[in-house]
């Protein structure tokens, strides 16, 4: 299903070639500043993994990855990654990262089962996937919030860089970020859907880190949103959201979490009815204490470019596939799809 919101009197303010130059600048500058601020080292990342490894991201649990086999078939089924959430934790151990050190990657994924293609959602996903080694004693809300604050400040700093080069296009971001839990939103607006609650709180606060995503909420007995049970700790995770004036909606730029430890892994797999995953190599390594405790997440590259440049559609900052009807409507509205 495809949906399209067209801002009234939309003006892209930049030609396609100007936009392409700005995209390159944002990507190159942000990854350098982000890596420095977080003490992260860029490493190479796979586009596909073995299904049998258990390293692919199961997302909400029902999406099927694009898969294939090699000519001789000896490696079994290979899957295009949905994200590198579990692979990164394995890489921290494999590459010898120590406490306080971490990695980030340039992750490209295909999510063919994306339910709705709209201004923010594409079948093509590009993000900076990152992961950092922490101590078990640092598996706290304070650690999570300190990390969120550092990432928010890096994004805010990028606004100033972009404004200096492209003053006509730069989107203004709020000065501060607020922290709120999904339970608090449900208690405040019980009759609204989770996405409507996000819109409400983001319009009120400007920028929000929404915590506790994946576990059942007190009133509805349903999660605010689905999260895979084998990497995010549902009590120590969240989404970084901005109010986005051009589309009059909440705008997610990043999702992050302190990762499950041995106990939370088993608890959440049981709640999700997915205890069969415990036999997979990744999960066995985690249970045996062979993987480091970590915090990690993903920052959308196209999402960040779209936000900082005030674009109306993610197709203005990434090359993807869109239904003909969407392409025609975008052309009529001066939305320049790449």
Swiss-Prot record:
InterPro entries reported in the protein's UniProt record: aa-tRNA-synth_II, aa-tRNA-synth_II/BPL/LPL, AsnA
Tell me the CDD domains matching this sequence: AsnA
- List GO BP terms, alphabetically: L-asparagine biosynthetic process
Cross-referenced Pfam families, in alphabetical order?
AsnA
Q: Which terms in the GO cellular component ontology are assigned?
A: cytosol
Question: What subcellular locations does the record give?
Answer: Cytoplasm
State which pathway it belongs to. Answer: Amino-acid biosynthesis; L-asparagine biosynthesis; L-asparagine from L-aspartate (ammonia route): step 1/1
Q: What EC number(s) would the UniProt record show? A: 6.3.1.1
Is the keyword Ribosomal protein assigned to this protein?
no
**Main location per UniProt?**
cytoplasm
Q: Which reaction does it catalyse?
A: L-aspartate + NH4(+) + ATP = L-asparagine + AMP + diphosphate + H(+)
The protein's superkingdom reads Bacteria
Recorded GO molecular functions are: aspartate-ammonia ligase activity; ATP binding; catalytic activity, acting on a protein; transferase activity
Keywords linked to the UniProt accession: Amino-acid biosynthesis, Asparagine biosynthesis, ATP-binding, Cytoplasm, Ligase, Nucleotide-binding
The record lists its disulfide bonds as none
Family, similarity comment: Belongs to the class-II aminoacyl-tRNA synthetase family. AsnA subfamily.
Q: Which PANTHER family match?
A: ASPARTATE--AMMONIA LIGASE
- Annotated protein name in UniProt: Aspartate--ammonia ligase
**What species does this protein belong to?**
Lactobacillus delbrueckii subsp. bulgaricus (strain ATCC 11842 / DSM 20081 / BCRC 10696 / JCM 1002 / NBRC 13953 / NCIMB 11778 / NCTC 12712 / WDCM 00102 / Lb 14)
């Amino acid at each position: 299903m495809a949906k399209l919101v067209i801002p009234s009197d939309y003006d892209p303010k930049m030609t396609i070639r100007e936009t392409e130059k700005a995209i390159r600048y944002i990507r190159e500058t942000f990854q350098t500043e982000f890596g420095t601020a977080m003490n992260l080292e860029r490493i190479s990342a796979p586009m596909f993994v073995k299904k049998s490894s258990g390293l692919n991201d199961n997302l909400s649990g029902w999406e099927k990855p694009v898969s294939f086999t090699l000519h001789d078939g000896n490696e079994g089924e290979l899957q295009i990654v949905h994200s590198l959430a579990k692979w990164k934790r394995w890489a921290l151990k494999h590459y010898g990262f120590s406490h306080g050190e971490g990695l980030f990657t340039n992750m490209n994924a295909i999510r063919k089962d994306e339910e709705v293609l709209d201004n923010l959602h594409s079948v093509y996903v590009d993000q900076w996937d990152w992961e950092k080694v922490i101590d078990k004693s640092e598996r706290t809300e304070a650690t999570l919030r300190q990390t969120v604050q550092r990432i928010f400040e890096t994004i805010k700093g990028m606004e100033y860089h972009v404004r200096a080069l492209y003053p006509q296009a730069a989107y203004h971001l709020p000065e501060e970020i607020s922290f709120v839990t999904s339970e608090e939103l449900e208690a405040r607006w019980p009759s609204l859907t989770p996405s409507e609650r996000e819109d409400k709180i983001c319009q009120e606060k400007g920028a929000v880190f929404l915590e506790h995503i994946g576990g059942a909420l007190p009133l509805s007995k349903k999660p605010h949103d689905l999260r895979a049970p084998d990497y995010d700790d549902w009590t120590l995770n969240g989404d970084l959201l901005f109010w986005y004036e051009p589309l009059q909606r909440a705008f997610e730029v990043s999702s992050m979490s302190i990762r499950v430890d041995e106990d939370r892994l088993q608890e959440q797999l049981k709640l999700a009815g997915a205890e069969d995953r415990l036999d997979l190599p990744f999960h066995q390594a985690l249970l045996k204490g062979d993987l480091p405790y970590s915090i990690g997440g993903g920052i959308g590259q196209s999402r960040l470019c779209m936000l900082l440049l005030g674009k109306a559609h993610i197709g203005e900052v990434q090359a993807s596939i869109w239904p003909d009807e969407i392409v025609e409507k975008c052309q009529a509205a001066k939305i320049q799809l790449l």
